[in-house]
Amino acid sequence: MTPTQNEIHPKHSYSPIRKHGLEVPETEIALDDSPSGPNEPFRIYRTRGPETDPTLGLPRLRTPWITARGDVTEYTGRERLLIDDGRSAMRRGQASAEWKGQKPAPLKALPGKRVTQMAYARAGEITREMEFVALREHVDPEFVRSEVARGRAIIPNNVNHPESEPMIIGRKFLTKINANIGNSAVTSSIEEEVSKLQWATRWGADTVMDLSTGDDIHTTREWIIRNSPVPIGTVPIYQALEKVNGVAADLSWEVFRDTVIEQCEQGVDYMTIHAGVLLAYIPLTTRRVTGIVSRGGSIMAGWCLAHHRESFLFEHFDELCEIFAQYDVAFSLGDGLRPGSLADANDAAQFAELKTIGELTQRAWEYDVQVMVEGPGHVPLNMIQENNELEQKWAADAPFYTLGPLVTDIAPGYDHITSAIGAAHIAMGGTAMLCYVTPKEHLGLPNRNDVKTGVITYKLAAHAADVAKGHPGARAWDDAMSKARFEFRWNDQFALSLDPDTAIAYHDETLPAEPAKTAHFCSMCGPKFCSMRISQDIRDMFGEQIAELGMPGVGASDSTEGMKEKSREFVAGGGEVYRE
């Protein structure tokens, strides 16, 4: 694996864990010495992958592991069609920027085999992917296998996405975040979406969903998968809808099935499937303030009403399971009836669908297919935990994956904040992965800067939840920052930040000179009113005496007299907190 040279801070370096023939990426942060002695480098989780030419794609890390198991076969695959890239490609006669890099024949399971991580885990096998994850999470491989076997965690790793570095989603592990990218009919290009992918993983996205609905859907996805070190998710109904000219009523199982196989062959690791939207649940949304806000949910609701029958996703769910088991694609069972406003939170429609999703989870597990369950949405703080509790009850502890939730509806332009508040709360209560929200939510398609803001905000929420849950090692990062802050190691503070660039920029707005990076104050309080500097001076001047005052056996009168004596010494010495 080639380390990236373009680190986000000069104190960062690529420092992988090398064990059992694996190379598991981590970032090492070099720290300056403290007054009391040297500090060990600090190590953090790394998602960004190797730095390569996007036209070539990433190294195929997992190919030897996949083929060594002897349960997959190469095959020709479906025929590529122009409609795969949408109506504009049909008019042009080609995609706007064809993928010209390496594209081996697709793999799928041999007849009678299931090549999912859940199938291996249930058979008692610790795969290379599980070993990789265990090193990454600093846990025992058997613990990883056990959680995957029980369905409480998933390792989304399509056999046709060997470039991905294995990661795990489950509430017993680090809280993960997802970043959504993808074009629309209005804006963006393939190059821009690949750039967003690289930008999102640079700042810490654990998975990325390609939600493209515009031109070149197939080709955009090919570029993204070939350049992604993290699992890629999609909502295949979007592409299927494009294939029938955007008319939901014209969708069919045959069109959808073909689209799913197309995406399985490309290497999509998990797919959002809105199979829980049942005909009987749609009337429950009529009294809502904001109706059905999920794009996939509204598409399927429209189809159900047009045909007055259950959706083909529900009716053909078992066949979907059979397909997913051949490629190790995980279900992300979509919450098509999620609330789009506080007024609609935790209503009958939302929870009716969640209960059905729980039943579908059990059916998928019968095929050894990995599952996570999607959740809301817009939910007041006091109503959030009920979502965790019901999901764990009805979906038997399958990983919960939520969009926020937003805890207030009054802040367009700041919904990354309104949702991060809810995200931290729901993750603390057991949600395994958080889907980021950017400042553009409800307003427009996010650009690179919005992607970064969304990722950083959600890394913060996820980490706060890990600290609250007592996840091993989570607090160590905060403690390293606090120590650097108290010792005025400014460059270490920047290096330990989630976003060093912004931390440096804010500091340098008022104190840009290089000597300010070693000063024992900042512009907030200045040199005379810095509480930490005053605390340090007090420690330096009275450290031993303070320690003595805290020792057992010192009576109250002795303590009082000792304080008076030190007060006299301080006044006699000039009465200055700061001495030259």
UniProtKB/Swiss-Prot annotation:
Q: Which residues form a coiled coil?
A: none
Q: How is the cofactor bound?
A: Binds 1 [4Fe-4S] cluster per subunit. The cluster is coordinated with 3 cysteines and an exchangeable S-adenosyl-L-methionine.
Annotated residues that bind Zn(2+) are located at: 378, 442
Q: Which UniProt keywords apply?
A: 4Fe-4S, Iron, Iron-sulfur, Lyase, Metal-binding, S-adenosyl-L-methionine, Thiamine biosynthesis, Zinc
List the pathway annotation. Answer: Cofactor biosynthesis; thiamine diphosphate biosynthesis
Q: Where does [4Fe-4S] cluster bind?
A: 522, 525, 530
Question: GO molecular function: any one?
Answer: zinc ion binding
What are the names of the required cofactors? [4Fe-4S] cluster
Q: Which GO terms fall under biological process for this protein? A: thiamine biosynthetic process; thiamine diphosphate biosynthetic process
State the residue spans of region: Disordered. Answer: 1-58, 554-580
Task: Specify which residues bind substrate according to the UniProt entry for this protein.
Answer: 180, 209, 238, 274, 294-296, 335-338, 374, 401
Instruction: Give the UniProt family note.
Output: Belongs to the ThiC family.
Instruction: Name the PANTHER family for this protein.
Output: PHOSPHOMETHYLPYRIMIDINE SYNTHASE, CHLOROPLASTIC (PTHR30557:SF1), THIAMINE BIOSYNTHESIS PROTEIN THIC (PTHR30557)
> Which HAMAP family does UniProt cross-reference here?
ThiC (MF_00089)
Entry protein name: Phosphomethylpyrimidine synthase
Protein source organism: Corynebacterium efficiens (strain DSM 44549 / YS-314 / AJ 12310 / JCM 11189 / NBRC 100395)
